[in-house]
């Protein structure tokens, strides 16, 4: 498995619109790619700025190539999303997953 990281910044005002764009446009296009496994958006914010990382998990680098095209490290950013961002990485980072531990939620009885 491979994790693809991309980061950007926006404003508190524009971030909800970016999330709507991500849900309506990005997620459907990711789901259509064989080998896409999951996506997360991580945030760090203050009263004005939202810094965020988009983390996508893929079955292989070949799956990422199907999504990203010939330059897998070039960020894939829809034209309609650009006006929502104050800054963004033009390149992405990929990391091979060497260890993954998931905990199962425990059920508590009241």
Where are the regions a protein language model picked out?
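Residue-level signal for secondary-structure boundary sites
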Residues: 14-16, 62-64, 100
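An amphipathic, aromatic/His-enriched active-site/gating alpha helix that lines ligand/cofactor pockets
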Residues: 24-36, 57-94
């Amino acid at each position: 498995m491979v994790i693809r990281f991309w980061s950007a910044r926006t404003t508190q005002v524009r971030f909800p619109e970016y999330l709507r764009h991500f849900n309506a446009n990005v997620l459907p296009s990711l789901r259509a790619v064989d080998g896409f496994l999951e996506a997360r958006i991580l945030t760090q914010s203050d009263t004005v700025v939202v810094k965020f990382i988009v983390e996508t998990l893929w079955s292989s680098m070949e799956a990422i190539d199907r999504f990203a095209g010939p330059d897998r490290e070039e960020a894939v950013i829809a034209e309609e999303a650009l006006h929502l961002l104050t800054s963004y990485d033009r390149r992405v980072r990929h990391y091979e997953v060497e260890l993954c531990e998931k905990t199962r939620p425990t059920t508590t009885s009241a």
